[in-house]
């Protein structure tokens, strides 16, 4: 089977298109508890002291509200609010950094919100703060999310001078009517200029985000967006399924249900996306992601060493992830932790305690085993029973007897091939990888929570 081959089977896609987790973690965030306290955090930090460190910093501010957005953000044009936020971040960074004094940072990512909401002086202040408090590898990956409406070319130069070497840009759709209906109108020519300039000044990796399922999108209109994106030629592409949840996200109430594409249209758009991007030379990595065949994500997947965390797919698997800022999530040791998600409470707690720890979970042995199984399937589309048995001292067929029974109907439908040695996800199964992973999710079996997740397609 070709590494990027997907066998589009509409009947199977419709059969299995029910709600499920995205598995940026296992257990998922639904299992986080507010009983998780500082002592558990410190225990997690001490678990694997030899691991390199990946840093995530959340910048929640945006100048404008995008109606589709479900992120943790604060829409304001009052720039001084960013200074107040940086004051709190400084407290948190100075409180957390000594715990990782012997670690080296191999990865830093700024997400949001809109990280480029910060002006040049604020960007420099935060980078200086991070470099003063953490030990960065000379070849560290330093990435940032960019809104093309909220950046000038000289800011890109400033980011590069501050050490940023990777760029992710939210484009979503090139169609003007779609942009207007989601309150995200942008200059197409400037997007091309921005990406080309990023390459010219030494950004080594570029990513474009698209969203399908937005109001007034059609397979025909999105085909134009795909054509323009392949002309942009980024190293990576993320094509997300829009989840319309107006009861959860107030901004989405501005989107009329009648304007949304039908379920069949969304499937048509997805099929068109996969065909167009693979014909343009991109490899389907999984879930929503595509990459050039020579991109390190694609290479890692072919070698069976791709990983996944709260930030998506990564080649850096054996690292601890420390998240800082409001709502930021960490993956440290055998635990997951999340900061306060309301800004007022974040400020209050950082001021009182130096950190903003809100909730988390310490993984059990069973959690860790299932985490490894799900990660192998979702990242590399295959699972070696012997590798799991050797690492965890168990007999796979016995330990996962119930799970393999749940997987059996999916095997009969041709989504996976199960042998004595392992599981291989087929070309039909790649699009439905979440369904396959759900067979190994013990928490789903305990609770009827299916309605809390987005549909798999």
UniProtKB/Swiss-Prot annotation:
Amino-acid positions noted as binding [4Fe-4S] cluster in the UniProt annotation, renumbered to this chain: 62, 66, 69
EC number: 1.3.98.3
Disruption phenotype: Cells lacking this gene accumulate coproporphyrinogen III under anaerobic conditions.
Keyword Manganese listed: no
Radical SAM core domain mapped to chain residues: 47-280
Record's cofactor remark: Binds 1 [4Fe-4S] cluster. The cluster is coordinated with 3 cysteines and an exchangeable S-adenosyl-L-methionine.
Annotated disulfide bonds: none
Protein name listed in UniProt: Oxygen-independent coproporphyrinogen III oxidase
Chief subcellular location: cytoplasm
Organism: Salmonella typhimurium (strain LT2 / SGSC1412 / ATCC 700720)
Gene it is expressed from: hemN
Cofactor(s) needed by this chain: [4Fe-4S] cluster
Alphabetically ordered keywords of this record: 4Fe-4S, Cytoplasm, Iron, Iron-sulfur, Metal-binding, Oxidoreductase, Porphyrin biosynthesis, S-adenosyl-L-methionine
Locations listed in the record: Cytoplasm
Function: Involved in the heme biosynthesis. Catalyzes the anaerobic oxidative decarboxylation of propionate groups of rings A and B of coproporphyrinogen III to yield the vinyl groups in protoporphyrinogen IX.
Gene Ontology BP terms: porphyrin-containing compound biosynthetic process; protoporphyrinogen IX biosynthetic process
Catalytic activity field: coproporphyrinogen III + 2 S-adenosyl-L-methionine = protoporphyrinogen IX + 2 5'-deoxyadenosine + 2 L-methionine + 2 CO2
GO cellular component: cytoplasm
Assembly description: Monomer.
């Amino acid at each position: 089977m070709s590494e990027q081959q997907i066998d589009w089977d509409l009947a199977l896609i419709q059969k299995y298109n029910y709600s499920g987790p995205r598995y940026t973690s296992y257990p998922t965030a639904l299992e986080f508890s507010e009983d998780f306290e500082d002592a558990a955090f410190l225990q997690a930090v001490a678990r694997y002291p030899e691991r390199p460190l990946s840093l995530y910093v959340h910048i929640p501010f945006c100048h404008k509200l995008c109606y589709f957005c479900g992120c943790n953000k604060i829409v304001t044009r009052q720039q001084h609010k960013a200074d107040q936020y940086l004051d709190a971040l400084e407290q948190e960074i100075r409180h957390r950094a000594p715990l990782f004094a012997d670690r080296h940072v191999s990865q830093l990512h700024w997400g949001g919100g809109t990280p480029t909401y910060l002006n040049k002086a604020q960007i420099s202040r935060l980078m200086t703060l991070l470099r003063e408090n953490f030990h960065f590898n000379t070849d560290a990956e330093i990435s940032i999310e960019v809104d093309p409406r909220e950046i000038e070319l000289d800011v890109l130069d400033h980011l590069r001078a501050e050490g940023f070497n990777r760029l992710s840009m939210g484009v979503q759709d090139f169609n003007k009517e779609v942009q207007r209906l989601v309150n995200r109108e942008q200059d197409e020519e400037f997007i091309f200029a921005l990406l080309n300039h990023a390459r010219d000044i030494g950004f080594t990796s570029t990513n474009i985000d698209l969203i399908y399922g937005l109001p007034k999108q059609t397979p025909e209109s999105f085909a134009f967006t795909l054509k323009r994106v392949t002309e942009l030629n980024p190293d990576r592409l993320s094509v997300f399924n829009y989840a319309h949840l107006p009861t959860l996200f107030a901004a989405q109430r501005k989107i009329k249900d009648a304007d949304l594409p039908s379920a069949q249209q969304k499937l048509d758009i997805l099929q068109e996306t996969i065909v167009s991007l693979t014909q343009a030379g991109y490899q389907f990595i999984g879930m929503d992601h595509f990459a050039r065949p020579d991109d390190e994500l694609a290479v890692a997947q072919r070698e069976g060493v791709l990983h996944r965390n709260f930030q998506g797919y990564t080649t850096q698997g054996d690292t601890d992830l420390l998240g800082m800022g409001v709502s930021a999530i960490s993956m440290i040791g055998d635990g997951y932790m999340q900061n306060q998600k309301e800004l007022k409470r974040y400020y209050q707690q950082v001021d009182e305690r130096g950190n903003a720890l809100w909730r988390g979970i310490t993984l059990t042995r069973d959690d860790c085993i299932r985490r490894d199984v799900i990660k192998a399937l979702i990242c590399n589309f295959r699972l070696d029973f012997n590798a799991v048995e050797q690492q965890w001292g168990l007999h796979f067929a016995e330990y996962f007897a119930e799970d393999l029974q749940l997987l059996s109907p999916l095997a009969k439908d041709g989504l996976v091939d199960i042998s004595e040695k392992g599981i291989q996800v087929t070309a039909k199964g790649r699009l439905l990888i979440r369904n396959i992973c759900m067979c190994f999710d013990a928490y789903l079996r305990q609770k009827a929570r299916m309605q809390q997740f987005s549909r798999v397609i």
